[in-house]
């Protein structure tokens, strides 16, 4: 899909279709009023006749509107003007793209980016329009022998901005929107891949392919032999029973002018399949445990977006690839593991494995002397119970970092909700035999998991993003969502100091 921005009057646009908004009840937007005036009341007459009420998502396609150069005009219902918010705006964009594809339009000029969305500027509206467009067009059919065909698919979208001085910010929004969309696309592709294909080695291969494309990206891998030398016994224990080798992939992006600038480190849990191990999961929906590498998919997707945007910062992405399987040599409930940090962990449940992988990685990244570390993981079902499918769980003992992350979530629409990380919860991890257990019990499960991780992050500022509820959808629309690529990408944009306001 090709995107561009321009500033101009709707009646002068030569395009297969121009898209304008209509408010409820039957009220023309400013741009629609211009078209109505040029067409001598053609549009308002249709509305008076009851052809379109203006309710959110209603569509009316007009052909050969008098005195308008475009072949078609698509009227889009936007609801009540004062109630047009972020969620409704994105839904309207998605419905518009679907309608344009159904009509066979190959190009369109969209004036919906000129609508007033509460608290949002041109940059946000253009960028969200691009991301919503690309998300709506995504499909995963790589393994289907019969692929569906879209009739004359939409190939070019032009977003109109109110004034010429906003063209630069619109172009920046396109740059960021297309980059984040590319990252989300990669995240979804990798996460949707079945576990017989997507194993830790596959994750590593995807990272290496990126390094061949982007010259400032370097990729190295650490296998089980090297992990053993490093003392990553906890990580190794989780993958011991799998026929697929555990592989930690390290992606180093050098974008800062000063190569010695401290890096931001992103760590992604990469359980390419989680059977639960000896503490075997129920069979129902176990197929979805291929998404237990959603954190790693989010990190590789964010690294893709970062490389596309060429941000002037140093970032290291870690894909903690592993597979948790049952076998005669699997680790067991009751085992006590000595982590890379030297701390010991009593295993109470082998299905609480993500934290056992992450704790060693969080110790490993100390060698980079990081500016900060953010780990992202499909860590706990408890987070899904607490927050559902809309907000990721954010944990951090560093208030400034937590506020930055929350702000990035609000900006990107990939929102997070801060959860407590109080010392009182730490007691729930007490063990009579080791320094801690890997399970704090049923109450506050997402919090005690974060408390566990916090014990391995004392040497840097750290945040933990639990995306168990947001990384994928179940049911009829089963598949990866592409999250948390938007929030992580926005965080990096902000950290890079890129100007995005008008």
From Swiss-Prot:
Cofactor note: Binds 2 manganese ions per subunit.
GO biological process, one term: proteolysis
Main localization (coarse): cytoplasm
Amino-acid positions noted as binding Mn(2+) 1 in the UniProt annotation, renumbered to this chain: 274, 351, 353
Reactions that this protein is recorded to catalyse: Release of an N-terminal amino acid, Xaa-|-Yaa-, in which Xaa is preferably Leu, but may be other amino acids including Pro although not Arg or Lys, and Yaa may be Pro. Amino acid amides and methyl esters are also readily hydrolyzed, but rates on arylamides are exceedingly low; Release of an N-terminal amino acid, preferentially leucine, but not glutamic or aspartic acids
SUPFAM superfamilies: Macro domain-like, Zn-dependent exopeptidases
PROSITE patterns: CYTOSOL_AP
Known EC number: 3.4.11.1, 3.4.11.10
Chain positions recorded as Mn(2+) 2 binding sites: 269, 274, 292, 353
GO molecular function: manganese ion binding; metalloaminopeptidase activity
Cofactor requirements of the protein: Mn(2+)
Keyword Oxidoreductase: no
InterPro entries: Leucine_aapep/pepB, Macro_dom-like, Peptidase_M17_C, Peptidase_M17_leu_NH2_pept, Peptidase_M17_N
Keyword match Protease: yes
Cellular localisation: Cytoplasm
GO cellular component: cytoplasm
Keyword field: Aminopeptidase, Cytoplasm, Hydrolase, Manganese, Metal-binding, Protease
Active site, per annotation: 281, 355
Family of this protein: Belongs to the peptidase M17 family.
Role summary: Presumably involved in the processing and regular turnover of intracellular proteins. Catalyzes the removal of unsubstituted N-terminal amino acids from various peptides.
PANTHER family per record: CYTOSOL AMINOPEPTIDASE, LEUCINE AMINOPEPTIDASE-RELATED
Protein name: Probable cytosol aminopeptidase
UniProt organism field: Shewanella frigidimarina (strain NCIMB 400)
Taxonomic path: Bacteria, Pseudomonadati, Pseudomonadota, Gammaproteobacteria, Alteromonadales
Underlying gene: pepA
């Amino acid at each position: 899909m090709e995107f561009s921005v321009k500033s101009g009057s709707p009646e002068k646009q030569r395009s297969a279709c121009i898209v304008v908004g209509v408010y409820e009840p039957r009220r023309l937007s400013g741009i629609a009023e211009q078209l109505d005036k040029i067409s001598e009341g053609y549009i308002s007459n249709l509305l008076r006749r009851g052809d379109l009420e203006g309710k959110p998502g209603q569509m009316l396609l007009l052909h050969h509107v008098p005195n308008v150069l475009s072949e078609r005009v698509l009227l889009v219902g936007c609801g009540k003007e004062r109630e047009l918010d972020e969620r409704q705006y994105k839904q309207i964009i998605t419905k518009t793209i679907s309608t344009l594809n159904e009509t066979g339009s190959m190009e369109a000029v969209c004036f919906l980016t000129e609508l007033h969305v509460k608290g949002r500027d041109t940059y946000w509206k253009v960028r969200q329009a691009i991301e919503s467009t690309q998300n709506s067009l995504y499909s995963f059919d790589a393994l289907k022998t019969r692929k569906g065909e879209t009739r004359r698919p939409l190939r070019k979208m032009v977003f109109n901005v109110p004034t010429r001085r906003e063209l630069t910010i619109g172009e920046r929004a396109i740059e960021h929107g297309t980059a984040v969309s590319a990252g989300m696309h990669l995240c979804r592709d990798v996460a949707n891949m079945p576990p017989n294909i997507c194993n830790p080695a596959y994750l590593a291969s995807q990272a290496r392919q990126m390094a061949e494309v982007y010259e400032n990206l370097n990729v190295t891998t650490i296998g089980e032999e090297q992990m053993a030398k490093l003392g990553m016994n906890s990580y190794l224990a989780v993958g011991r029973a799998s026929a697929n080798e555990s592989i930690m992939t390290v992606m180093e992006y050098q974008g800062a002018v000063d190569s010695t600038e401290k890096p931001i480190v992103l760590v992604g849990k990469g359980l390419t399949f989680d059977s639960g191990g000896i503490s075997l999961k129920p069979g129902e929906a176990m197929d979805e445990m291929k998404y237990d590498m959603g954190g790693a998919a989010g990190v590789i997707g964010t690294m893709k977006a970062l490389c596309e945007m060429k941000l002037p910062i140093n970032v290291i992405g870690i894909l903690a690839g592993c597979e948790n399987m049952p076998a005669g040599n699997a680790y067991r409930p009751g085992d006590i593991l000595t982590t890379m940090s030297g701390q010991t962990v009593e295993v109470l449940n082998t299905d609480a494995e993500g934290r056992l992988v992450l704790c060693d990685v969080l110790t490993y990244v100390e060698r980079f002397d990081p500016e900060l570390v953010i780990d992202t993981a499909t860590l706990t079902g408890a987070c899904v119970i607490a927050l559902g499918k809309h907000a990721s769980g954010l944990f951090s003992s560093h208030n400034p970092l937590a506020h930055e992350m929350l702000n990035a979530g609000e900006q990107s629409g990939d929102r997070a909700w801060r959860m407590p990380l109080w010392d009182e919860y730490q007691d729930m991890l007490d063990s009579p035999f080791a320094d801690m257990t890997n399970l704090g019990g049923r109450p506050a499960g997402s919090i005690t998991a974060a408390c566990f991780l916090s014990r391995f992050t004392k040497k840097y500022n750290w945040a933990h993003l639990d995306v168990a509820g947001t990384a994928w959808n179940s049911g009829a629309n089963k598949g990866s969502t592409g999250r948390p690529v938007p929030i992580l990408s926005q965080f990096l944009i902000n950290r890079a100091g890129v100007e995005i306001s008008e």
